[in-house]
Design a protein with these regions (language model features):
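Short glycine-rich, Thr/Ser-proximal phosphate-binding strand/loop in the N-terminal lobe
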Residues: 3-45, 49, 123-132
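Phosphate/ATP-binding catalytic cores across multiple sugar-kinase/actin-like superfamilies
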Residues: 53, 192-214, 264, 268
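Conserved phosphate-binding/catalytic loops in two-lobed NTP-binding clefts
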Residues: 86, 234-259
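Glycine-rich phosphate-binding/hydrolytic loop that grips phosphoryl groups
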Residues: 140-141, 248-283
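Glycine-rich phosphate-binding loops at beta-strand->alpha-helix junctions
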Residues: 209-236, 250-254
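Short beta-strand-loop/turn "lid" adjacent to the catalytic site in phosphate-handling enzymes
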Residues: 34-40, 54-88, 115, 124
């Protein structure tokens, strides 16, 4: 048996996972998962703290970890051995969490991506939003702050909206102006939030069409924890006659990138040892 660690460093949080494998890389098991908000702390300290918590929880030393892999802003992890692109990591993590999915929508703080994948997590096609677009978690946090609503509450609150008004779908600045106008017109907070979620979902459904999504789609990233956003995604998917998509989430969707990094770490470790991997044997 050997262990790997996957670390997904985002702009507002660090996700860390610890996985165990059989000697041939088979039967990967998720032993530890952690999400830590960065806030104004030193990112390297946040990363190191999460790593040490994982070791302590399972009675391991740093020398017991066969491979540490990162994704996201991995250059901030000075003890990593390897780094994997975000799409590669999220795709691998998604297949681990739900083998039925053939597409992934990764909704992060700064941008979102739609990926078409195969059963072995290979990314076949992808599209992504721009950093300034109104389809990101950071945009949603800005709106929540303006409305005086806790970020953890906006999803449930948006589900109460019964007459939503959608905002501008491309530019975050214009969308925020729309929200200010809605507040001045007396639109309820629930309807504003539901309209925002629907507008964000509409943009992402457009990305899904571009990559020719068909079948089960797993939402990963921070917005997977937002029930209002997930509901808006399914509503928009159901209303799009050009798309056949079933939106899914998993309790560990937010950790998909870190899980994928840990899984690829196991693959890389065996390759470096000159051993055949479970993945290569299945090919």
């Amino acid at each position: 048996m050997f262990h790997t660690v996957g670390i997904d460093v985002g702009c507002d949080s660090v996700k860390t996972t610890l996985m165990a494998f059989e000697d041939d890389g088979s039967q990967p098991r998720l032993l530890f998962k952690d999400l830590d908000k960065i806030r104004k702390r030193n990112i390297k300290h946040v990363v190191r703290s999460a790593f040490e918590r994982a070791l302590l929880r399972h009675g391991l030393d740093e020398a017991d970890i066969a491979y540490v892999a990162t994704t996201g802003e991995g250059e901030l992890v000075d003890f990593r051995r390897g780094h994997f692109f975000s799409m590669t990591a999220h795709a691998r993590g998604a297949i681990f969490l739900d083998p039925s999915v053939r597409a992934v929508v990764d909704c992060g703080a700064l941008h979102a991506k739609a990926m078409l994948i195969d059963e072995r997590s290979k990314v076949l096609a992808y599209r992504m939003t721009s950093q300034c677009a109104s389809g990101s978690g950071q945009f949603l946090e800005n709106i929540a702050r303006y409305l005086g609503v806790a970020i953890d509450d906006i999803g449930e609150l948006s589900l109460r909206g019964d007459s939503p008004e959608q905002v501008s779908g491309i530019c975050a600045v214009l969308a925020e102006t729309d929200v200010i106008n809605m507040v001045s017109r007396g639109i309820s907070t629930a309807n504003i939030l539901r309209g925002i979620h629907l507008s964000m979902a509409k943009r992402l459904i457009g990305l899904m069409r571009m990559v020719k999504t068909n079948g089960d789609v797993l939402v990963t990233g921070g917005l997977a924890r937002n029930p209002g956003f997930v509901a808006a995604m399914q509503e928009m998917a159901d209303n799009d006659k050009r798309l056949n998509a079933n939106i899914k989430i998993h309790p560990d969707s937010v950790h998909a990138g870190a899980i994928g990094a840990a899984l690829w770490a196991g693959y890389r470790h065996l390759r470096l040892q000159g051993q055949p991997t479970a993945q290569s044997q299945a090919a």
